[in-house]
Amino acid sequence: MTKIIGIDLGTTNSCVAVMEGGIAKIIENAEGSRTTPSIVAYANNETLAGQPAKRQSVTNSTNTLFAIKRLIGRKFDDKEVQKDIKLAPYKIVKADNGDAWVEVDGKALSPQEVSAQILRKLKKDAEAYLGETVTDAVITVPAYFNDSQRQATKDAGKIAGLNVKRIINEPTAAALAYGVDKNSNADQKVVVYDLGGGTFDLSIIEISNVDGEKQFEVLATNGDTFLGGEDFDLRLINYLADEFKKESGIDIHQDTLALQRIKEAAEKAKIELSSALQTEVNLPYVTADASGPKHLNVKVTRAKLESLVDDLVKSTIAPCEQALKDAGLSKADVSEVILVGGQTRMPKVQEAVKTFFSKEPRKDVNPDEAVAMGAAIQAGVMSGAVDDVLLLDVAPLSLGIETLGGVMTKLIEKNTTIPTRASETFSTAEDNQAAVTVHVLQGQREMATDNKSLGQFNLTDINPGPRGSVQVEVTFDIDVNGILNVSAKDKATGKEQSIKITASSGLTEDEINRMVKEAELHASEDKQKRELVDQRNQADQLIHTVQTSMTSLAQDQQTELKTLIEQLKMAVNGSDKAAIEMRQSALQEAYSKTMQTEQAQSQQAAQHQGNAANDGAKDEDIIDADFEDVSNG
């Protein structure tokens, strides 16, 4: 059976893993790292994903897309998107369907398309490691992701050429990676404290023993989608810039190249201060003014960094309190606290978590890799490689329809274990009503207008009758991925209408297919570019070989080869692979013939010398003997 990979599609970094020999193994990317920056850049008609995109992020900020996960499956008018518009250096625009898209070089791109670039890179890295084509994946999402965001994540997978077998919640995946389900047969309440690069997610999970198998249920979620390690970096960047300004009088924020260097140095210093008490940020020639080059040299202590980010760490505690309250639990009810996300390596963060929960948090799994490992374990469950886990997630928000008076009537309550199905019968609101509009909603508020609209459809041609006499059965059906299907049926006639909730916020099937084709086209272009580079490299190697070895050749032979070399160099400077191949073949053929001729002449000369030597040797073999005449005559 082909492998199913597990993917953590993160806001700041992403990660891919696979089950091997019953163990979840993280797959390194082409750059040799175990995590890949969730960054996509568009530069010089080329699309960069991961570390190459990150390296040029400051100098090409308007065309470098990061934290795109904050936009996926969201409407442009959402308050979270409006906040992002003020912070993001790239342009966020309103799509025709009201979704939040981004614009690069005048072209509108959906977050699904951009996320697909990251997924495609992870897919490619997995294929390089496994030595086989990968088509199936399990992808994780935050527990609070609504139906639109989950569907959009699946669409991103499809555009990347992946069949998304399952969408699972990140905290559930982390709990699987930590093996919390193996610790005890008793029911457990586990807190997952996930402070990543761009978001903070706090989840409380209940792990129950159901007929010898473990059931995972998310009891509560909370957090801040605009708080993460990047905010910690920013505090240190601003501190370094302020110190530099005090020293030199130069505002480094105006120099994008210098700012890129400071950004990288700040991130490195922050990481170092998780294990060291002091570090030094030393950037020679960081910028210059009329008086000459300037150098940045600042000592930073752990205590200083902690004072800079103290309020950020404290701000993670309120969501912990709220989640406990929502779950109806006290701190004493918590069995374990597990840490996820790179920022949880910071000692001050660990101390804050320990102080609040009065419990030492678990940190025995790499926090950057835990979610991807959990996704790989779930992939193993689906492929049959793992057989002792039963994974049951829950609906993150209540689902229902709009009824008389603009009220939301809930059919599926928040935190209901999925997959699930619920039906309820409604009656017509007016006499002789010939059609019923079913308006599907998601949220916790009482009034329809205060909740998120997921879509609507009409059940037409129902039998007219007095108000309340026509019975319409509405059924909500959520699959294991949290994707919702809604149907309405006239009980008298059996006439039925249904909708798969995708169109309200997301891409149409035609749009997805177009993006898949574009992705395939880019894959083809990428392949052609790579083949062109390989051809150029081969040509350069041949040129070097010929130039090195032709110095001993006759002048006329050298002249012919030099002409062919110049022709090949001209072809290499162009972009026509066929032309390079043709010129390379011509040079190779001429060089081979010349070398064969040279070799034949060398052999003849050697043979001639050998023959002459042999003749000389024969003469030398004749021994002049002295004969003594012994005859008596």
From Swiss-Prot:
Instruction: State the superkingdom.
Output: Bacteria
State the UniProt keywords alphabetically: ATP-binding, Chaperone, Nucleotide-binding, Phosphoprotein, Stress response
Quote the biased-composition stretches of kind Acidic residues, using this chain's numbering: 621-633
Q: Where is the composition biased (Low complexity)?
A: 599-615
From the UniProt entry, list the residue stretches annotated as the region Disordered.
595-633
Coiled-coil segments: none
The record ties this protein, via PROSITE patterns, to: HSP70_1, HSP70_2, HSP70_3
Q: Which InterPro entries match?
A: ATPase_NBD, Chaperone_DnaK, Heat_shock_70_CS, HSP70_C_sf, HSP70_peptide-bd_sf, Hsp_70_fam
- What residues bear Phosphothreonine in this entry? 199
Copy out the induction comment. Answer: By stress conditions e.g. heat shock.
Q: Which Pfam families does the entry link to?
A: HSP70
Alphabetized GO MF terms: ATP binding; ATP-dependent protein folding chaperone; unfolded protein binding
Classification via HAMAP family: DnaK
| Entry similarity comment | Belongs to the heat shock protein 70 family.
Q: PANTHER family per the record?
A: HEAT SHOCK PROTEIN 70KDA
- Quote the function comment for this protein: Acts as a chaperone.
For this entry, the protein name equals Chaperone protein DnaK 1
Organism of origin is Colwellia psychrerythraea (strain 34H / ATCC BAA-681)
